[in-house]
Amino acid sequence: MMKRVLIITYYWPPSGGSGVQRWLKMSKYLPEYGWQPVIYTTENAEYPIVDPSLEKDVSSKVEVIRRPIFEPYTFYKKFLGIKKEETVKMGFIEEKEKKKSWKTDLSLWIRGNLFIPDARRWWVKPSVKYLKSYLKAHPVDAIVSTGPPHSMHLIAMKLKEELGLHWIADFRDPWTEIDYYHDLHLTRWADRKHHRLEKEVLTKADKVVTVAPDGAKRLGRIGNRNVRVVYNGFDRDDDATTTVVKPEKFTITYLGVLSKIQNPEKLWEALEEVTKENYDFANKLQINMIGQIDSSVVKVIEKRGLSLYVSYSAYIPHDQVSAVHRSSTLLLLLLMPDSEPRAKGLLTGKLFEYLASGRPILCIGPEDGDAARILNETGAGTTVSFGNKEKMKEAIKTLYNKYLEGNLPNNTSPAVEKYSRRNLAGEFAEMLNKVKS
């Protein structure tokens, strides 16, 4: 008999971006392992990215419950004079190099000190009230909360306390160790409250899961417990209708959000030098930057004289992503410098979709990090630390020569398949079975 799992998630189609992918795909494959997902999500959320193409990925076996949510962003936009159609950055954090007005600073202070743990805190009480009634009429065998936003964990924690349900807390990103946490102008009181709630979630959940080994260690230290890793992954179904266009040029592609801290300045230097040293390379070079690219990155690219090689595009629907990957010569994975505390454990969702493409990957990040280990294990690419310009040049020139020879690597290693969404859903189902027993 099919078991039922309630999944509490803020991000759900038509939301686009990385936050929606994990549980959209997990819910698609969990029924194959005997678990019917019941999604509890919002009906009127203000998502920073909207992607209607993802609606077709919602399995017919998934029950979806949508409930209204109060979003403070409407007031935030009015206060700052932001147009209604413009999106608000995660955490209300604006680019650091922009001069901030007193209104921006005040809004940031309110976000950090009154919206604890985040701006969806007002959804907790009405959600608990609704779900208590729903679950009495429609029992489930387990619940999963996924954050951020971490308010989702508070809903699940209350349900566990009041109904005694088995609960798995899924951390797609950290809480108090998230990159922008220290930009929130927190008072001592607010900082203590964030840490208290985080520890409460980590200690009260029956199981805690996250997306990378380093992140599991960090959460484990906070909660004084073992934290399980279930990676993000790729869905082979995304490739089913992919039309691959062989690139006319040596095409380097980056797809996703690129922040100031991820800006690989030595890579742009390396590319500048190779274009000056090799006229043929300069003629054949094409760089595609797709997604939300921080202005600081654009400035460095301009400074290095690379603008004529670069094409910028906004967010593209997820059903076009696979074709873009497979129509590229080289895929860029840009993490963080080794000096950043989270750098070694950063495993973005794009890594796994890059793996599925079979195209060579150049990762700029810690050479002893989690991403580097996966690239080595699968033979899918090379990792170079942020400061090693010469190694970057060597990697680019080696791949360019293979491109000229028509001998580009096309990774088909069986090791890649362990990161398929279907396999990872099986791992999560195994954990659900253990929690229930």
Where are these regions (language model features)?
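Carbohydrate-associated surface elements
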Residues: 214, 230-233
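A conserved catalytic-core segment of Leloir-type glycosyltransferases
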Residues: 42-121, 125
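Acidic anion/phosphate-binding donor-loop and adjacent secondary structure
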Residues: 72-78, 234-249
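Conserved donor-binding/catalytic core segment of Leloir-type glycosyltransferases
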Residues: 244-271, 424
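Acidic donor-binding loop of glycosyltransferase active sites
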Residues: 206, 311, 325-344
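Nucleotide-activated donor-binding/catalytic signature segment of Leloir-type glycosyltransferases, i.e.
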Residues: 284, 289-291, 296-322
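Membrane-proximal helix-turn-helix segments that form the acceptor-binding/catalytic region
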Residues: 129-132, 151-154, 158-162, 175-176, ...
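N-terminal subdomain of nucleotide-sugar transferases
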Residues: 1-74, 207, 227, 430-437
